[in-house]
Amino acid sequence: MYQVNTESKGSLLSLRQGKEKTIWAVGGGKGGTGKSFVSASMAIHLASLEKDVTLIDADLGGPNLHTFLGMKDSNLDLGDFVTNKVPNLKDTVILTPFVGLKLIKGTENVLFMANMNYYKKMKLIRHIKTFDAKRVIIDIGTGASYNCIDFFLLSNPGILVVNPEPTSIENAYYFLKSCIIRILKVVTEFYGIEDLVNKIAVHIKDNSKSIYTFLNEIISHDKNSAHILFRALKRFNPCLIINNARSERDFLLGQSIVDVVKKYLVVDLNFLGAIPHDEKIHTSLKRLTPYLSTYPNSEVALSIRSIVEKLAYK
């Protein structure tokens, strides 16, 4: 089903210009949710449909996407661009075993990349936005650092991968909340209503207060500013995938999370579906054989194909 590429895996690419691009960013707020497996699998299936997909490993300091693709290490990685060893992001692109799928491998320079400064980050974001590929999928790191949040907000949409466990759900919720804080701070500064910035930060970080409650308070003081903030949040439409679902309750969990996020964070979260648990995923990883290639008709593969096609052709 997934055609193997006959070109050299290490070749660099000269990419064409001028195509409309979609960027998906896959995160989770917490490690161990399976986001890298989901990112790699989505990219493999999308490439089989569209033949022009680039996968970027932006999990700074802990790159592993190449392993999920059945590849060994390469000489070039994202750090070579960020540290100016190569002038353009496209210079770090390598071919994968899958036709239509390219990879930008993450860097293992933990200390440098995890603390990438603002100017280097903005340079990377500019290059990603102008990168010549029809579809770009970014596997971002864990946690709620500005780097993770800004890569997530760069996308259209950002995709949260969550396990049906309390800690994973809680981390995803607070990751979304951090994204909203980031959006509101940027918007207030852009529109010259900086007097709200400190109030936003103090109020929203109080876990007893919801975004909805806060915005209603703003309406009572400044309706125009509240309208600006509501409008900004309406443009933030993240998506949700439940991974490692084992029970019927796990498969139904997504809609419950959507309802809570809408009620307390005033954001429309789009539930894409659930991916069932399968021990063979770990077996495939140990053997360096991509799961979708080995088990193309499994329930996991069917779920991933459904999610990708829902996202790509909605």
Please give the residue ranges for each predicted region.
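Extreme N-terminal, non-catalytic leader segments
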Residues: 1-32, 41, 45-47, 51, ...
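C-terminal boundary of histidine-terminating zinc-finger modules
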Residues: 285-300
